[in-house]
Design a protein with these regions (language model features):
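A generic secondary-structure signal for well-formed alpha-helical elements
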Residues: 34-42, 149-160, 311
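A general structural signal for short secondary-structure junctions and capping/turn motifs
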Residues: 68-70, 92-98, 118-120, 169-170, ...
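Extracellular structured ligand-interaction cores
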Residues: 100-102, 123-127, 205-207, 247-249
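A translation/RNA-centric and nucleic-acid-associated enzymatic feature enriched
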Residues: 109, 179-337
Length: 337
């Protein structure tokens, strides 16, 4: 069963068809601005990968992929959780050089997702990746890229508010980004849970970037789980915006500079899975075949929620919901797609 909260007095700013029209515009406008800012080229991506290839994203390490047999190949395949590792391999395959990158529409099924206003089992995002140099593996370069993404989000919002006057006086994004590490966040709010820390900081600043996610903090616990074999835990981040309709932080993007060989070995050991180094993808990384990269995912439904002031992800995407959620939305005038 999902957990749902409908704000008192909530009303969608746009009707059902205008919502669909706006979703289409957001996806077109933002992708163009993102590609221009980060020098990305659009490519086609897989919906599934071979089990055991090491290409699927293990997320927090406990989520089960949707798997199925392929009799013609005598193999098992998995629906992707994300394309974090596939994109890096693709950049190697295409022979891209530093400064060049790719973007794709990623559609995934996350069967173990806990459903609520922001989460469904269907995930749609722009997955992007670009080749970088060793000198660019710094927090400063990470922050420069965050600014580029936030600028693209705000510019998209500006165009949308011009096309839909109903949004003009109701949607306001903060262009200034407040950066903080997870350790600084824990030091600042020692008695809060990680989610409470994110909400407190985002409510104060509007647009925030939380850096260095995955490693253990002074408390002995990580801020959040991250797979050990794509992001470098010292060079990654989440971008969050304060979302007034739900009075909470809305995570729009998880991104980072990817592991090099040293970081991969270190993080596999820390995660207790050093044997993963024997998988095909990991061997290519460890022997220096794969390029140094950075990348991330930007939620398409999340961006639509943010720019349209929506209270439930089901207002901007089609997914599956339990009867109680459907009834609660119907009673509150929330139109699920």
């Amino acid at each position: 069963m999902s957990h749902i909260t409908i704000p008192e007095g909530y009303q969608s700013l746009l009707g059902l068809y205008d919502t669909q029209k706006a979703i289409g515009l957001i996806k077109t406008i933002f992708q163009e601005k993102l590609c221009m800012a980060l020098h990305l080229k659009r490519v086609t991506a897989p919906l599934f990968v071979m089990q055991g290839s090491g290409l699927n994203d293990d997320l927090n390490g406990v989520e089960r992929p949707v798997a199925f047999d392929v009799p013609s190949l005598n193999e098992q395949a998995e629906v992707v959780h994300s394309l974090a590792k596939w994109k890096r391999y693709a950049l190697y395959k295409y022979g891209f050089r530093p400064g060049q990158g790719i973007v794709t529409d990623m559609n995934a099924v996350r069967r173990d997702e806990e459903l609520d206003n922001l989460h469904s089992i269907y995930v749609d995002q722009w997955d992007w990746e670009r080749v970088i140099t060793a000198d660019q593996r710094t927090l400063e370069f990470l922050q420069e890229t965050v600014w580029d993404i936030v600028d693209a989000v705000c510019a998209t919002s500006d165009e949308l508010r011009w096309k839909f006057p109903e949004l003009k006086n109701n949607i306001h994004l903060d262009r200034e980004v407040a950066f903080i590490t997870t350790q600084e966040l824990e030091d600042r709010y020692p008695d809060f849970t990680p989610k409470q820390r994110e909400n407190a900081f985002a409510k104060e600043h509007g647009t925030v970037c939380i850096m260095q996610i995955g490693g253990r903090l002074k408390s002995g616990q990580p801020h959040d789980g991250r797979a050990p074999d794509y992001d470098d835990w010292t060079l990654n981040c989440d971008i969050l915006f304060w979302h007034k309709p739900l009075d909470c932080a809305l995570e729009l993007s998880s991104m980072g500079i990817r592991v090099d060989a040293d970081a991969l070995r270190r993080q596999l050991d820390a995660a207790g899975c050093p044997k993963r180094a024997e998988l095909p993808f990991h061997k290519l990384l460890l022997d220096g075949t794969l390029p140094l990269t950075m990348g991330g995912g930007i939620g398409q439904s999340r961006l639509c929620m943010l720019l349209l002031g929506k209270a439930h992800v089901g207002e901007v995407q089609v997914s599956l919901w339990d009867d109680a959620t459907v009834q609660a939305c119907r009673n509150s005038g929330v139109e699920l797609l």
